[in-house]
Amino acid sequence: MSTKAWNASRLSGPDPSTPWSLRKPLQHGSRPPKGKRLTVCPPTRPKQTIRISASHASQQLDQAKAACLAVTIKDLEEATAVMRSWEHSLVTPQCIAPRYSIIMFMITAVKRLRESKMLTLSWFNQALMMVSKSGEEMRNLRTAMWILANLIPREVLPLTGDLLPSLQQQEPPMLKQ
């Protein structure tokens, strides 16, 4: 605290209630009184750029791709559910041996993607062996996988395993031969 006291009858210093901007400025070349210090802003450091390591940046990119893949899988689940309800309204009850359609194969693949995040060539080959007796089901399976490969964005396609990237580069399968 200050040792000087402010007295209404005699001013021993500047009035503390006077705003700083209205106080009398110093004369050119004079110094402020010794007892008072000027408030100076603390020295600031120059702005530094933030450095992010390459591994951190690639990790963030992978996380963004994984999030994009999760959203894509969710969208595909919703779309295949709509297509399945549409397909059931068109199917006639005369079918004795139910066959897997393109939509049913897509639903199966999307469920597999949701659960394991992978569609591998070995899984595809196993599915082909199961439907190998029916040429129509084999075409439906190939068509469904090709459609999925083209529905999933290209930048996240490698995260789905080795099946879909290889199918995307191929020509579209023929539905009717």
From Swiss-Prot:
Polar residues bias: start-end ranges: 1-10
Region (Disordered): 1-38
InterPro entries: Paramyxovir_NSC
Coiled coil, from the record: none
Pfam family, one: Paramyxo_NS_C
Family membership noted in the UniProt record: Belongs to the morbillivirus protein C family.
Protein known as: Protein C
Origin species: Rinderpest virus (strain RBOK) (RDV)
